[in-house]
A protein has these predicted regions:
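Bacterial Sec-dependent N-terminal signal peptides
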Residues: 1-36
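N-terminal carbohydrate-binding/catalytic regions of secreted carbohydrate-active enzymes
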Residues: 42-168, 174, 181-184, 304, ...
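Active-site-adjacent structural elements in enzyme catalytic domains
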Residues: 127-134, 176-177, 192-202
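Solenoid-like repeat scaffolds
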Residues: 397-406
Length: 437
């Protein structure tokens, strides 16, 4: 009996040892897997959040002091100079105005906030946000959380109650950056304001004919989140880089959806841009096919100027579609270069021919060599390393924000695109990561 008992004791001990080995093995495997996933995640973040942004002006031979002065002058011209587009109201508010159209619109207001947070201009940012929230953001009803897209800043009468989806896109991203840069305990809870827009966006289900800013079936931004405008899009509203920012910093439980939207936007741009010229239509269906309207015939016009800059932004910040984006930049710059780098005009049919219908701007209905398009096309010189593209960089360096020979002058749209592009090419347009615990 003693021998039998001794044998069973050995067997029981062996079982316990085997169980311990299994537990140790499983725990080790889990730890290695978790560590691997963590390493991959950190590697991805480090790859695009290193803080290293190319200064293409410096690479082109311009001095850093000259570069800083040029960027600062462009900022001061828009925000403080005699032709400024930024106007302070009382002690705590301000607005950005599209001078030629005699209004303030969410496009320019949210651009102003993005510029302010990039340059660490907290007071400017706060003033524009307070004005936007007070006079444009809907605080109740089906549109709650959204913004009226246009208002007369003198009479404060809204030109429309409806939203233009790109305004909200920039407001949200700018607020998240402000939260990262300044924290949320300095008078405005930037994170809460960004989340409010997003949370209200997710409540929109068609009640009152108002929808999500993003068509949730197509996973693409809508032209307007209302009625039929929810069913098509504007290529210049496609900012995949911004969705990546939302996925990382909004923390609203929709991270995967935003990542999907970023990927969908990238693929959409492949379809929307002409295979030879790189040109896109101002408005398209979600397929990328042009979507002409009674007020906007098919063609590459003012809205579309922003597309090359948006593609540059995605390339510089995240670089997840490099092969196509590098090919796009060569095609797009190559087409404009073929028209004359100092003379290419600003509206085209997608095949590069001259359109029959010319869109008017500021009372002028004519084609011109516009600073805005020169600026955004120059920003694409950051895509890849093509020495030939430095001709655009030099052309932008030598350009000036001033009236054209016929008297037309647009410090608002030309000016903002010019400033954004100077920021890009000097390495000053960056992802703002959290700087406060």
């Amino acid at each position: 009996m003693k021998a039998e008992t001794h044998i069973w004791e050995k067997i029981s001990l062996l079982k316990i040892i085997l169980q311990l080995i299994t537990v140790i093995f499983l725990f080790g495997t889990h730890s290695i897997t978790a560590q691997t996933k963590k390493s991959e995640s950190e590697k991805l973040k480090k790859e695009y959040h290193t803080g290293a942004y190319r200064n293409l002006f410096l690479e082109a031979g311009y001095g850093q002091t000259e570069i800083d002065k040029k960027v600062e002058k462009a900022y001061l011209d828009l925000f403080e100079g005699p032709n400024r587009i930024y106007f302070e109201v009382g002690d705590s508010m301000a607005y950005v105005s599209d001078i030629k159209n005699h209004d303030a619109r969410t496009e320019g207001l949210s651009y102003g906030m993005m510029i302010a947070v990039q340059f660490n201009k907290k007071e400017v940012f706060d003033r524009i946000w307070r004005w936007s929230k007070k006079y444009l953001q809907h605080q109740e009803g089906p549109r709650k959380g959204y913004f009226a897209w246009s208002i007369d800043p003198k009479t404060l009468k809204k030109n429309s109650e409806g939203s233009a989806s790109d305004g909200e896109l920039y407001y949200i991203t700018s607020l998240l950056f402000a939260s990262n840069r300044w924290g949320n305990n300095t008078g405005i809870d930037y994170y809460a304001e960004a989340r409010n827009i997003l949370d209200e966006m997710w409540k929109k289900d068609g009640t009152g004919n108002i929808y999500n800013l993003i068509n949730t079936d197509a996973k693409q931004i809508s032209f307007v989140p209302e009625g039929n405008g929810y069913k098509w899009t504007d290529p210049s509203y496609h900012l995949p880089a911004f969705y990546e920012i939302w996925a990382e910093y909004a923390k609203d439980g929709h991270e995967q959806f935003y990542k999907d939207c970023a990927d969908t936007s990238r693929v959409f741009l492949h379809r929307a841009c002409h295979p030879v010229t790189g040109l896109n239509a101002d408005y398209t269906d979600f397929s990328g096919k042009p979507h002409p309207t009674p007020w906007m015939p098919e063609g590459f016009r003012y809205d579309s100027w922003r597309v090359p800059m948006n593609i540059t932004l995605d390339y510089v910040w995240y670089g997840r579609d490099k092969t196509w984006q590098e090919d796009y930049a060569k095609r797009f710059q190559g087409f404009l270069r073929s028209k004359g780098i100092d003379s290419f005009e600003d509206q085209f049919n997608l095949d590069g021919s001259t359109p029959e219908t010319i869109l008017q701007a500021g009372g002028f209905k004519k084609l011109r060599h516009s600073l805005g398009l020169l600026a955004t096309s120059s920003s694409t010189s950051l895509i890849g390393k093509n020495e030939k593209s430095l001709d655009f960089v030099n052309a932008l360096w030598n350009a000036k924000l001033e009236p054209y020979q016929d008297g037309y002058f647009d410090p608002y749209y030309d000016g903002l695109l010019y400033l954004f592009s100077l920021m890009h090419l000097s390495g000053k347009y960056q992802i703002i990561t959290p700087q406060h615990k």
